[in-house]
Amino acid sequence: MANINRNNLGAIGEHQVLSRLLLLGYQAAITNMSVDNMENIDIFCRDSQNRYAAIQVKTTLANDINVGINHRKFFDDNGNVDLAAGLEYLESKIVGPWVMVQVSGTDSDPLFKFFIMSRKQVIEMIYDSERWYLTDFNRKKPLSGNGGIYLPIPWLYGNGVVANNNHKEWINPFSGHSFENQWQNLWND
């Protein structure tokens, strides 16, 4: 695929999700069309039962999803790991379900994969993987809290990470469960 700037990539993902929601029979609108870059919400959606979802869309060309949060949120002011503070931050920032879009293929024949997680599932996945990353690695020097948090695409298929000399095993809290095309997760919490 050609070099796509970040804003265009985000718009591509949002429009693909919007199209899919409309095809599924939902009423949906991209919030950024009427509200200037509404934080944490990209699409409002309503189903036939008048349930609403405030959806965050994350789009990638890579094999992982940048969740838009850095490790610093899981540290206290003294630089110590503070998982409770990280969880509190996740619960305040993540306001609804997420649809993660992986774009591949070519410019003339793009392919889109959709991974749908409820708000609760997103929080649990990020929290548990961050707990593992911050506490179950053999590090010679402590982390500074810099750097972004990513969810590798294999994790969205329910895969974990085997132990090695650098870290303990990470057992995916959704082991064996694929989030691909799980649109019903929009309505779960």
Residue ranges and their predicted role:
Residues 1-39, 44-189:
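Mixed-charge (Asp/Glu-Lys/Arg
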